[in-house]
Amino acid sequence: MAQQAADKYLYVDKNFINNPLAQADWAAKKLVWVPSSKNGFEPASLKEEVGEEAIVELVENGKKVKVNKDDIQKMNPPKFSKVEDMAELTCLNEASVLHNLKERYYSGLIYTYSGLFCVVINPYKNLPIYSEEIVEMYKGKKRHEMPPHIYAITDTAYRSMMQDREDQSILCTGESGAGKTENTKKVIQYLAHVASSHKSKKDQGELERQLLQANPILEAFGNAKTVKNDNSSRFGKFIRINFDVNGYIVGANIETYLLEKSRAIRQAKEERTFHIFYYLLSGAGEHLKTDLLLEPYNKYRFLSNGHVTIPGQQDKDMFQETMEAMRIMGIPEDEQMGLLRVISGVLQLGNIAFKKERNTDQASMPDNTAAQKVSHLLGINVTDFTRGILTPRIKVGRDYVQKAQTKEQADFAIEALAKATYERMFRWLVLRINKALDKTKRQGASFIGILDIAGFEIFDLNSFEQLCINYTNEKLQQLFNHTMFILEQEEYQREGIEWNFIDFGLDLQPCIDLIEKPAGPPGILALLDEECWFPKATDKSFVEKVVQEQGTHPKFQKPKQLKDKADFCIIHYAGKVDYKADEWLMKNMDPLNDNIATLLHQSSDKFVSELWKDVDRIIGLDQVAGMSETALPGAFKTRKGMFRTVGQLYKEQLAKLMATLRNTNPNFVRCIIPNHEKKAGKLDPHLVLDQLRCNGVLEGIRICRQGFPNRVVFQEFRQRYEILTPNSIPKGFMDGKQACVLMIKALELDSNLYRIGQSKVFFRAGVLAHLEEERDLKITDVIIGFQACCRGYLARKAFAKRQQQLTAMKVLQRNCAAYLRLRNWQWWRLFTKVKPLLNSIRHEDELLAKEAELTKVREKHLAAENRLTEMETMQSQLMAEKLQLQEQLQAETELCAEAEELRARLTAKKQELEEICHDLEARVEEEEERCQYLQAEKKKMQQNIQELEEQLEEEESARQKLQLEKVTTEAKLKKLEEDQIIMEDQNCKLAKEKKLLEDRVAEFTTNLMEEEEKSKSLAKLKNKHEAMITDLEERLRREEKQRQELEKTRRKLEGDSTDLSDQIAELQAQIAELKMQLAKKEEELQAALARVEEEAAQKNMALKKIRELETQISELQEDLESERASRNKAEKQKRDLGEELEALKTELEDTLDSTAAQQELRSKREQEVSILKKTLEDEAKTHEAQIQEMRQKHSQAVEELADQLEQTKRVKATLEKAKQTLENERGELANEVKALLQGKGDSEHKRKKVEAQLQELQVKFSEGERVRTELADKVTKLQVELDSVTGLLSQSDSKSSKLTKDFSALESQLQDTQELLQEENRQKLSLSTKLKQMEDEKNSFREQLEEEEEAKRNLEKQIATLHAQVTDMKKKMEDGVGCLETAEEAKRRLQKDLEGLSQRLEEKVAAYDKLEKTKTRLQQELDDLLVDLDHQRQSVSNLEKKQKKFDQLLAEEKTISAKYAEERDRAEAEAREKETKALSLARALEEAMEQKAELERLNKQFRTEMEDLMSSKDDVGKSVHELEKSKRALEQQVEEMKTQLEELEDELQATEDAKLRLEVNLQAMKAQFERDLQGRDEQSEEKKKQLVRQVREMEAELEDERKQRSMAMAARKKLEMDLKDLEAHIDTANKNREEAIKQLRKLQAQMKDCMRELDDTRASREEILAQAKENEKKLKSMEAEMIQLQEELAAAERAKRQAQQERDELADEIANSSGKGALALEEKRRLEARIAQLEEELEEEQGNTELINDRLKKANLQIDQINTDLNLERSHAQKNENARQQLERQNKELKAKLQEMESAVKSKYKASIAALEAKIAQLEEQLDNETKERQAASKQVRRTEKKLKDVLLQVEDERRNAEQFKDQADKASTRLKQLKRQLEEAEEEAQRANASRRKLQRELEDATETADAMNREVSSLKNKLRRGDLPFVVTRRIVRKGTGDCSDEEVDGKADGADAKAAE
């Protein structure tokens, strides 16, 4: 029953498919698909076709509807209903795909193949298709053998991994709620079952169980209920399952992406937070609730919606399942309780309430009950916790202060803490699961990755999390498109097969670039990261920057809703998504309270402190948090000190994921959501259609059908399928390609089914599966034959064995019979009794000999035992010696291995250093290029400053002229004031109407600009259709003219001749009617002509209309153009009327020649025509006179505007001179700035390079010293202990000498780099002082320049406004009332034109869409027909093959019948022979009977002589018996022969009947086949002809489109060139000035940042160098202690004191040189106290060493007590070795700390202080380790008591080494002195730089005074201007208001725009 239920949801009902009624109905009704608003598409019957439309009858209700042909889609035959692979559909279109999916979904079949991938629709219910039996059904099966299922996809990936040894990935994609997570679980379930190393089904391995239980844990902690999905994954995961070579699972790893941690604190309506919160509150027992302080749901603020339940799920049961899963995963109970405590603590954090105090904004906590619960659960102090929230300690300067928080800040801190705590717990859980899943020791050979990431989300308002999720889905969809469409076709082209590249238009790269592009222009994430750098940045500024940078992007839109709605929109592949950028900056930076984080790090709860162990790396500064590095192996390792945001980390993780997926073979599963109501059995067609379009399902099927999805390498194809063509390939060598060609010929494959490339054979879909089936059949036949041979061989072998047994039995029988005859013979009895007696005597002799031999053997045995005991003793001794030698040899090999490892490390470090050197060289080259670029910029700035100075001079002269002109203009203004008051009302009306017109025109022009691109693409089609339309219109006009002329004549004849007959009256009536129609047609004709002309000139006139509306000149030009157009229309009308009159004449002559009345009417008509001609000529003359008047007016206006233009040019020249003077000054400043930048860049580059080299070489030096000392010790040990193993000793000596050479080389390199470092430090200090001076000068000059630029801009604005007002007043006075009338006429005309244009544009757009639809429909039909043609060809080839096979079978039947006839003849002959034999045998039998009677008589006669004749009697009896037997056998043979003869006769008759039937059937089949073949040939020929016609038509259309496109492109390029030339003159000056200002500001900001960084890094570097030198002194002193005890201790104390003095001196110098270094003074003092404490402990240890030295001296004096002396020496040596190693580790750690402190200066020493504290803890641990190692050393010394002499030799060697170390210490002290001298020189240079800076400051003050004077003059001018008239004041205020809201660059642009307008 269970299997039948599962089959219902897997297999299709064949009866439904093979229904003949449905087939007949489909063929009879001509069923098609038509669009439906309700069902997407619905079936209809095609009734009639009328032009472009068709009449269809809907199947559902029988209603007849008119539908456009382009909207109709073909329907597949019923046999394709519910097809499993949609690539098999004959008609591939959206309707067929949707119908197939819908039918399968309603039948419970949720899985459907779509070409190469699988489509699954969420059923919203449980289906019985995931059991163990179903898994077994799909195990090892091919894809076409089983129905579609997720198991089939998984099995295909698994088999491909095993067969091709290629990593696989299964990508489950789709929207949220489509079923991705459930399908991911089914994939893991199948792999755990199939690839388990445990064969039994019941006994499942621990690893497989843990793998299956990982998902429930992650779902509990990372999934939640949303509006669309009850179990929505709120994080992404990539599950990597590793397999060994045999295909067994050896481990797994889970990578997670972007947990939506904000859900832990708030949820949307009807949504839940993460499941684990509800599981815990519902499933915890009373004891657990009291321990975790749990409360009801409504008591928690973070549970926004209270207790929201999920239908069909019990939270209590799920809690038990989750705890059981954690137990299976191996998570101990204490860690489980830690997780639950953290969950309860997160809930309690939401209950902490804050209150605002009355008089201040400070927050307070009136009730700390929740805080006490949180502190109890998390193991922290409640007072410290509340203090850290309400009054956290922050660092201000060098001190720490407590800052009071507001209520909002406290709430934000609590929420941030809750989110961070939950996120860290989730990361820890993932790390713990990975640790459990990756504990096996087996090596993984390949892997299968399963991707389950959050689906595409479109809410009403979407936030930062949705952007990241949708960005991920965009990348995955792009991967799908690239894999399915681009890479597939590129491989076709790469392999050189015939293929036309198809562009499916599914490139998502623009949208991805909009989000992730780093620069040019930067994407949204880059802009977000950039805004995070600025302290005053807000979400609003971020949105403004996004709109500014990406406002013109095609995938970016501004929202059209209210202000509180979305901030911007992005057009994703799944639709348009509105984003609200609230708190995006905070989410991207993810800040946290440092005080609380430190408190949690120090928690008494081990689990909580483990979660917060990386407290020093909480904020986005530094690299990723330490825990995230381990928990998220996908994180990229970046340089320390970089600002790491959430967006950057997620982008890097996603980049690594995409790289992993690209390196695998992807298998796509497209999950589709059927409805948003989560109802089972309901499918929303439009929703599914949108998902199918977005996912590229149709395109994937089409490329699968048209392309060659299966491909095999030549060698593999030959190896796999050569069994199908055994004799096709000749023996000997043959190229793989030639062999494949021969094999394909032998296989008789159709040429359309395959393509042969350069390295592979490509097959269409299904061909390879067919070959696999044939191969399986062939292998089956071969195996059956092989089995038959084996069985025959075994049967023959068994028969031979039975024959041997038979002969043996006969021998035994014969022997037994002989024995029975002999046993009673007396002589035999005597022989048996005597024979044993003969052997007894010989046996006694043998016993005596054996006894003698036994005695000898015993003696030998005793001797051998003695020798054996001796040998055993010797063996035991030798074994002991052997063990000793083996131990020695093992020790030697280990030493050699260590030496080899050291050598490998040194080589690796050498390579790293070389790589670093190459990187530094590359950086040097980059810096040189940057310097060159800066020099070029410097020259440009100098030129700009010179130009500005000249402009200032010109402006000064212009200002004086303006003062003179001001008096005259005031007088003019007074005169104009009266006129202005009169015209003001009219002007206001005109201005308002003009504004409205301009706004409408601007809107229409923007629309036209947007549609222009479409019109260009449409131009190709439009020109073609216009030509067709013009032809048709001309024909229509001719016919209409003819009809109109006839009707006119009739009407006129009616009016003129009332006395005519009735026929004439009817004609007159018709003429009257035709007159009316003629008037209408004339209007339509005029409109059509105007439309054609305006559309032809639309592209050329679109840009001109904006300028025409701006000024009255453009209005006059527009009037002129309209008059010309009307004149042309009138002329055309005149010509048309002339043509009509001529036509009327001819017709009248033809029709009315018979009557005289008709002649009179014709004469009257001619008179009327002459009158009409005269009126037309008069109208033309008046029209020309009007045009002449308008031309005169236009010329006068042009002359006046030219005069004004000359005046404005002169003013502009004066302003440009002043601008040049200012630009010259700015150029000088820019030169100085660039020089400073260049110096700074060089110094920074050199400093970083030398510091990196110094650090690397110091590490290398310390490693070399350690290696050298270790090798020296090991060499001495080897010399003493392994005298016999001389070969190994020589090898170790050679290695040690090689390492010493390397060490000496490294020492020389270190000295060189140190000298370079000294020089670089000197240069850096000098440059830094100069840089400070120049920066001060730059700032002063920059301020001066900004003030002067502001003054210049104000003057330019005033001048522009004055000129604009003057020109406006002049125009108003001149134009007057005429302007109003012309404006109104122009307004009406423009409105008409715009309405006509918009209507025509809509018509063209609709026509274009219609043509596009027809094109796509025809293309799809063509593709379907091509596919159908391929299928027909394939079927024809299959039929031909079947015909050949049938002929072969017929020939075989004929041969078989001939064989049967021969066998029949042969059997008859044999029967006749056997009859004769039977007769002869019968005669022989009669004779034998007679002989028997005679023998019986003789028997009676001679019975008395029985004994004598016994033998003869027996012989005769035997012969009789044998004769009887032979008789019976012959009779039996005769009977058998008769039966065989009868059977043969029957068979012969049957074969003859069968032969007749076969011949009849053969004739019938041949006739039928010929008819079918002929019909199909005819059909194929017809289809071929149709296709050829369609292809020719398409080619012709394509050629026309190409020509039109080339013409349009040429016109477009010409227009663009003209536009660029016009815009270039306007924009060059503005762009240069704006770019210079922007570059100057950027350089200033960079200069400030660099100076701050330089000061901070210099202070930190000097402090760290002092500490490094101190530690280096300690290291060298401790190394000296190891070799010479007393001298080392004294040297160490001196070095320590000296280092402390130097440290104090350097600390004082740092405090004096940099003010910012005092920020960390308090922390430094605390750390120094800690260091002093450690130094005291070190002195205690040194005191211990002094005691050991005393013992050593006593041992030297008392040489007799050599053993104790040896103990002391060895303990001392081992202690020094440990101390040296410890100091080396300290040195390495301090150097690492140096790098970390340099990188962490920006975060105010927080990270460095934490690192130092961690370092102190490590030093304490090292002290403990030292004591343990000392004890181990004492144990080791006891073993080496016999080796005192060798130790003494080692002591002498160590003394020599100590002397060398002393020399090195002296060198280091000299280097320290040199560094001090460099520091003093740097301070002197700093003083000199300060002096020069003060000098520049004085010069700057002088410059500011001059600027103030100029400002005063400007202000005086402003006061004078304010005393002017009202209109001027109004306009000036408007300008100020506009500039106040804009940036500086926008102000400059507007000022320049005003200049341009004034110039016009």
From Swiss-Prot:
Biased composition (Basic and acidic residues): 1035-1055, 1122-1148, 1332-1352, 1948-1960
Region of interest (Disordered), ranges: 1035-1057, 1117-1167, 1327-1352, 1768-1788, 1877-1908, 1939-1960
Start and end residues of each IQ domain: 779-808
Domain Myosin N-terminal SH3-like: 27-77
Record note on modification: ISGylated. Ubiquitination.
Pfam families assigned: Myosin_head, Myosin_N, Myosin_tail_1
Residues modified as Phosphothreonine: T1939
Gene deletion effect: Reduced litter size and increased polyspermy in the perivitelline space following fertilization.
Name of the protein this chain belongs to: Myosin-9
Species in which this protein is naturally found: Mus musculus (Mouse)
